[in-house]
Amino acid sequence: MLVNKFRVKQRVANLRWVSAAVMLSLTSLHAWAFSIDDVAQKAEKLAEKGYEAPKSNLPAQFRDMKFADYQQIRFNQDKSYWNSDQTPFKLQFYHQGMYFDIPVKINEVTATEVNEIKYSTDYFNFGSVNHDPATVKDLGFAGFKVLYPINKADKHDEILSMLGASYFRVVGKGQVYGLSARGLAIDTALPSGEEFPRFREFWIEHPKPEDKHLVIYALLDSPRSVGAYRFVLYPGSDSMMDVEAKVYLRDKVGKLGVAPLTSMFLFGPNQPSPTLNYRPALHDSNGLSIHAGNGEWIWRPLNNPKHLAVSTYTIENPKGFGLLQRGRDFSGYEDLDDRYDLRPSGWIETKGDWGKGKVELVEIPTADETNDNIVAFWTPENLPEKGKPLEVKYRLHFTKDEEALHSPEQAYVMQTMRSTGDVKQSNLIRQPDGTTAFLVDFVGGKLKDLDPNTPIASQASIGDNGEIVENSVRYNPVTHGWRLTLRMKVKDNKQPTEMRAALVNGETTLTETWSYQLPANE
């Protein structure tokens, strides 16, 4: 039989071409993957350009509405994104309104492509808000939220909210929203005024059916900064979020706040309410905790000062810091509506060496609980040069397990109480003596195993603006810990007064360091 050699060669060539095409297709499919580098490329190019302020496309009717009207606009539960997909995660979106008047672009990342999630009025129920559909046709979203069956297997609850500037909030099982985290803070508490970077675009990975985490990318922008972010959200009893950031500076900044946390403190036992209130405490957080690079643990109770106050802690390679809600008994709050006893602590667990810098605490006066008046962040000693990124990684814990956030060997501060200082007279009546008293209860660690007769003492110090007139320690049989009593006099009431204390047994330090600033004019 004659063989047509040309046809054989042609078939072989065709087979080779098909094989090569298949291999190329498989290689391309395998090689395509969205990553933080894609966002970083956008950020780097954006940083080279001058800043362009975002423009609002919001009709006046929505921009001028009151909060009660904004609450009328609810997401249509039947339209949750990924509703029909085999994944435990669902997405819902925030409508623009009030001061949420700048659209953010939201994209979905699949195994093969990136697609923008387009705004539609079908996503929302507008309640009694009358509007012209034509004016909001291409409006865009203000932000988004993530839902997950965190509390019950058959019910999706909100676990993440990303709305406004670079703010986001996360909750775990049995928690309610409290403090917020941010992508970046610039010039907080400086006379020049604070700059608020904003997330202008998001990319959300479509999760696989078996995924128990959600990956989110974000592009941050502001007059003097641009940033690429990767967030990995892990829902659970204590929800966690891994954060990777690459920040580029367009121009010099006075203060760069990395891993910022924002909270609220109105009053508590260390600073009782000036007006009669049935609540013993009203706050999202009651203290700043720091785990320094040298192993020291520091606890700084929060204040609501009459004037702006800033406290700094110089540290090299911090291991962690956070704004905590210590004390979970409902009797410490007594609020059935807002449940401050269920609000999570926020803890920054650093990854890698962060170098030299400061943990900074900013306390801002507030008359009520509607204002976030507490900010904590890390500010590096050395800022990146223009065009070069500041790269940072950390894990954010949203937790009610404060027991895990201090040394198991050392005792921690259970509570700080402030009172008018007094002395007991011969007739047993207490007489105010012009001092201020602080009572600090230390519990846990090795303290709980010590004999009540152990000669525990305190190492206490005070700044130049104060004088300690009493420094005593006694066993507390109720807590099985020790209570420190400090009575102090302020020299100049117009200035704040710094104090520090820790309990010791001989040369052995038994507790974390209690650090406190008595605000001016108190």
UniProtKB/Swiss-Prot annotation:
PANTHER family: GLUCANS BIOSYNTHESIS PROTEIN, GLUCANS BIOSYNTHESIS PROTEIN G. The gene is opgG. Belongs to the OpgD/OpgG family. The keyword Transmembrane helix does not apply. It is found in: Periplasm. It comes from the Bacteria. Pathway: Glycan metabolism; osmoregulated periplasmic glucan (OPG) biosynthesis. Keywords: Periplasm, Signal. GO terms for biological process: beta-glucan biosynthetic process. InterPro entries: Gal_mutarotase_sf_dom, GH-type_carb-bd, Glucan_biosyn_MdoG/MdoD, Glucan_biosyn_MdoG_C, Ig-like_fold, Ig_E-set, MdoG_OpgG. The keyword Signal applies. GO terms for cellular component: outer membrane-bounded periplasmic space. Its main location: periplasm. Involved in the biosynthesis of osmoregulated periplasmic glucans (OPGs). Seems to be required for pathogenicity. GO terms for molecular function: carbohydrate binding; catalytic activity. This is Glucans biosynthesis protein G. It comes from Dickeya dadantii (strain 3937) (Erwinia chrysanthemi (strain 3937)). Residues 1-33 form the signal peptide.
